[in-house]
UniProtKB/Swiss-Prot annotation:
The chain crosses the membrane at residues 320-340. It comes from Vaccinia virus (strain Western Reserve) (VACV). Belongs to the orthopoxvirus OPG086 family. It is found in: Virion membrane. Residues 2-319 are virion surface. The lineage of its organism: Viruses, Varidnaviria, Bamfordvirae, Nucleocytoviricota, Pokkesviricetes. Induction: Expressed in the late phase of the viral replicative cycle. Interacts with OPG143/A16. Component of the entry fusion complex (EFC) composed of OPG053/F9, OPG076/O3, OPG086/G3, OPG094/G9, OPG095/L1, OPG099/L5, OPG107/H2, OPG143/A16, OPG104/J5, OPG147/A21 and OPG155/A28. Except for OPG095/L1 and OPG053/F9, each of the EFC proteins is required for assembly or stability of the complex. This is Entry-fusion complex protein OPG094. Residues 1-20 are annotated as: Disordered. It is a single-pass type II membrane protein.
Length: 340
């Protein structure tokens, strides 16, 4: 019987291992990937040597370092947001920043520590205390404060904490603005109250404005608090006083009581207003602004009431003398008869 045949196969070394995508990650090149991570989100950072763990923990104190596999594979788990109100609230564009030696930067530099802002920090009311104080100071940004006040009327946060912060803000604004509504933050508050256009907002506007001092009313609210002579004159016309009284047509609408504001809306008044926050021009640039009026008429304070205009024209027209016209007519007729 035949015996079995054995064949010796050639020996080969196993192929080298192929690194996975996770193994190719480098934590030192992932600053912009790690920073935006949400709460309880994992960010894989690849293999991490033991001697680098403390350095990574110091750079990212808001995260917990987690082992994910052999060979030192690791990940960072976000646990908190350490950004401060002054650094996060006084802008609407910042999600995080890097802090080093007491200075902050939007870009990472060696030795800097990450501090992140809470998501939707303005919507949750976490900025109200800081911005309320900052917007009354000397270094505030009017656009930021105006935007913050406006956003308060449209917050989506409906938690107990968020609602209580909003109530506290309204109460503080009402107290502050009742003393002096000319403060920039108060003028913004009145503007957004008017735009909110509810019965409660209208009542708050009128309450705040009625609390103003006599000097304030004399300076800013002469439309809402007219003189006796102006009131008596207004009885002569069917048109609302707000339509022809220059104190109304030229008034700051934020300082009008609701009834005056509504009456002004019934008028047909041409108004021109231009606001430029930032304008950059060079030698080739040109700028032209026009309201469709001549220079002499652009800032006219003549009342716009039509009846008054007609009366004004009649009063200043020449006086017709009928008896002189009659005599002149007879003289012309006599001359014609004699000439014939």
């Amino acid at each position: 019987m035949g015996g079995g045949v054995s064949v010796e196969l050639p020996k080969r070394d196993p192929p080298p291992g192929v690194p996975t995508d996770e193994m190719l990650l480098n934590v030192d090149k992932m600053h912009d990937v790690i920073a935006p991570a949400k709460l309880l989100e994992y960010v894989h950072i690849g293999p991490l040597a033991k001697d680098k763990e403390d350095k990574v923990k110091k750079r990212y104190p808001e995260f917990r370092l987690v082992n994910t596999g052999p060979g030192g594979l690791s990940a960072l788990l976000r646990q908190s947001y350490n950004g401060t109100a002054p650094n996060c609230c006084r802008t609407f564009n910042r999600t995080h920043y890097w802090k080093k030696d007491g200075k902050i930067s939007d870009k990472y530099e060696e030795g800097a520590v990450l501090e992140s802002c809470w998501p939707d920090v303005h919507d949750t009311g976490k900025c109200d205390v800081d911005l309320f104080d900052w917007c009354q100071g000397d270094t505030f940004d009017r656009n930021i404060c105006h935007q913050w006040i406006g956003s308060a009327f449209n917050r989506s946060n409906r938690t107990v904490e968020g609602q209580q912060s909003l109530i506290n803000l309204y109460n503080k604004m009402q107290t502050l603005c009742s003393k002096d509504a000319s403060v920039p933050i108060c003028e913004s508050f009145l503007h957004h109250l008017r735009a909110h256009n509810t019965e409660d907002s209208k009542e708050m506007i009128d309450y705040i404005l009625r609390q103003q001092s006599a000097d304030f009313k004399q300076k800013y609210m002469r439309c809402s608090y007219p003189t006796r002579d102006k009131l008596e004159e207004s009885l002569k016309y069917a048109e609302p006083r707000e339509c022809w009284d220059p104190e109304c047509s030229n008034a700051n609408v934020n300082f009008l009581l609701t009834r005056n504001y509504n009456n002004l809306g019934l008028c047909n008044i041409v108004r021109c207003n231009t606001s430029v926050n930032n304008l950059q021009m060079d030698k080739t640039s040109s700028l032209r602004l026009s309201c469709g009026l001549s220079n002499s008429d652009r800032f006219s304070t003549v009342p716009v009431n039509r009846a008054k205009v007609v009366q004004h024209n009649i009063k200043h027209s020449f006086d017709l003398k009928l008896h002189l016209i009659s005599l002149l007519s007879l003289l012309v007729i006599w001359i014609l008869i004699v000439a014939i």
